[in-house]
Amino acid sequence: MKGEILHLHLGQAGTQLGNSAWELYLLEHGLGHDGRPDPSAKDVVDGGSYETFFTETSNGKYVPRSLFVDLDPSPIDEIRTGGYRQLFHPELLISGKEDAANNYARGHYTIGKEMVDNVIDRIRRVADNCHSLQGFLIFHSFGGGTGSGFGALLLERLSTEYGKKSKLEFAVYPAPRVSTAVVEPYNAVLSTHSTIENSDCTFLVDNEAVYDICRRNLDIPRPSYDHLNRLIAQVVSSITSSLRFDGALNVDLNEFQTNLVPYPRIHYPLISYAPVISASKSAHESFKVQELTFQCFEPNNQMVVCDPRNGKYMAVALLYRGDAVPRDCNAAIAALKAKSSFNLVEWCPTGFKLGINYQKPMAVPAAPGDGGLAPVDRSVSMLSNTTAIAEAWSRLDHKFDLMYSKRAFVHWYVGEGMEEGEFSEAREDLAALEKDYEEVAADSYEGDEGEAEY
């Protein structure tokens, strides 16, 4: 018994990411669209352990342990009428009547407050059905109203009710150039401030970086959100694959925190994935373990726009899937450490966590020319806690400052019952976060002044 994991998908970004993730899980476990075993499924290794993600009903159907919440009815109505309507439990699709209008305060204070008890109640019901609940995976965006506001509210409630369970977030982070809302910087800063204490580990993904990967590696001239989400789903799947399938080195949720988070506040690992390659090119490439490992350290394969060569790595988790043996993986790491461009902080000599899983990576089949991922024998996902991600925070803070210096758009937030002081408080917290990253990167780390903080 590996322990169950509950997926929470909040807001439009979380819901659409959820669709792609479950689409992939069904494929990996050999289940059809309605959650029943699909007789035509190939490559399925006796289905792995279903319990982690699915509840089995008495008539042999598998129901995802997942909850979809959005204050805006339309994304969830799409699930209710879409191809997977038979799959999800209708009680676990919760939609509001009016949306959060890209406003953190609406998601956190006014509209979100009315829904949160109902949502916690449903979570409790699913959690009570579990033998040993291991934790929560929370999918949301930092830029939208529901994702940022309601996401923060729900995490606050989860940490009071399920304090000991691990809470891992997948957060879609506002990209430098691609923006879906003017007030994204406000929402993201406010949301980060209120979740930083309540989340154990937050994997950041920014749309621009994933767009670039799709454009460059999959030759999709204009990637859609489906393309992006399928790529992110691969990473989500490899993070949880060792809970579901056998491997040489299994990794559970708590191990990510233990190995990736050196200080409670510095819990924002970067993710990268290799190989991202289209079916037309895959015949001409060799995917040796070492090459894949090196690819992960290329800025081109990372899911946040920042340059790790400017920072130092504190900890790295490499999760291999498919045909990989520990010896090759260790050799790849040794070769990597020998490269001069790879900087580890001095106070963390080993720096690497390995996971190896025998279940081969699968890709959702796509029409030729639609830029699907090529089926490959092995893949690697890398989660790395690097000080370079501070670049992403300082970009965000800069945008926040530009708007806040003129108090632009602030009245929308205050009108929903927020106090203006919360803006400056959140901004100070992020300034402190940037400073934390600076201190960690400084090699001569003075223990005595750092002790008061941690």
UniProtKB/Swiss-Prot annotation:
Top-rank lineage group of the source organism: Eukaryota
Main location (coarse class): cytoplasm
GO CC entries: cytoplasm; microtubule
Binding site for Mg(2+): D72
Feature type site, description Involved in polymerization: Y454
InterPro entries recorded: Alpha_tubulin, Tub_FtsZ_C, Tubulin, Tubulin/FtsZ-like_C, Tubulin/FtsZ_2-layer-sand-dom, Tubulin/FtsZ_GTPase_sf, Tubulin_C, Tubulin_CS
Catalytic activity: GTP + H2O = GDP + phosphate + H(+)
Any Gene Ontology biological process: microtubule-based process
Alphabetical list of PROSITE patterns matching this protein: TUBULIN
Binding locations of GTP: Q12, D72, S141, G145, T146, T180, N207, N229
Record note on quaternary structure: Dimer of alpha and beta chains. A typical microtubule is a hollow water-filled tube with an outer diameter of 25 nm and an inner diameter of 15 nM. Alpha-beta heterodimers associate head-to-tail to form protofilaments running lengthwise along the microtubule wall with the beta-tubulin subunit facing the microtubule plus end conferring a structural polarity. Microtubules usually have 13 protofilaments but different protofilament numbers can be found in some organisms and specialized cells.
Family: Belongs to the tubulin family.
Protein name per UniProt: Tubulin alpha chain
Organism: Colletotrichum orbiculare (strain 104-T / ATCC 96160 / CBS 514.97 / LARS 414 / MAFF 240422)
Taxonomic lineage: Eukaryota, Fungi, Dikarya, Ascomycota, Pezizomycotina
Gene that this polypeptide is encoded by: TUB1
